[in-house]
Design a protein with these regions (language model features):
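Short, polar/acidic, helix-capping and beta-turn segments at strand->helix junctions
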Residues: 1-153
Length: 153
């Protein structure tokens, strides 16, 4: 078992098989030592999407969990990009988080903490940079979408 798998087991997290892209694009791309993960939606292991506007149909806590599910799907894509060897991953460089919300919503950062907190537990060496943006809508009416960049050895 590699170091990342040991950490995941310790915090009781399983990386899912990631969902297929919902459009005509690659789930990830690689440039030198960087892996760019396309936007990941909160699609659960049973194929359901957590949908709706945050603080209207989705609570803050549900949105945070959706962000965690989205970053787990990103980790699933990363695992494929690394031929199942997550020890190749040096760090998470950046997370871009998009929140489907009403105009007066301002807790975007709290929502995306659902993803950042998990990444910090796994890759505790370096914190990643991040942006949290509010949107009027997202693909498939998802409540959250997470895009990420990782560095590999």
């Amino acid at each position: 078992m590699n170091k990342i798998e040991e950490i995941l087991k310790k915090i009781n997290i399983t990386i899912p098989n990631p969902p297929k892209p919902v459009g005509n694009y690659a789930a990830f791309s690689r440039y030198e030592k960087l892996i760019f993960i396309s936007g990941q939606l909160p699609i659960t292991t049973d194929g359901k999407i957590i949908t709706g506007k945050v603080m209207k149909e989705v609570s803050l806590e549900q949105a945070q969990k959706a962000a965690e599910i989205s970053i787990l799907n990103a980790l699933g894509q990363l695992k494929i990009a690394c031929n199942s060897d997550l020890n190749k991953v040096k760090s998470c460089i950046r997370i871009s988080g998009y929140v489907n919300c009403l105009d007066n919503f301002s807790d975007h950062a709290k929502v995306i903490n659902g993803a950042s907190d998990l990444i910090a537990k796994i890759f505790s060496v370096n914190l990643h940079s991040r942006i949290a943006i509010g949107c009027n809508s997202l693909p498939l009416n998802a409540c959250v979408e997470i895009e990420s960049i990782f560095e590999i050895n």
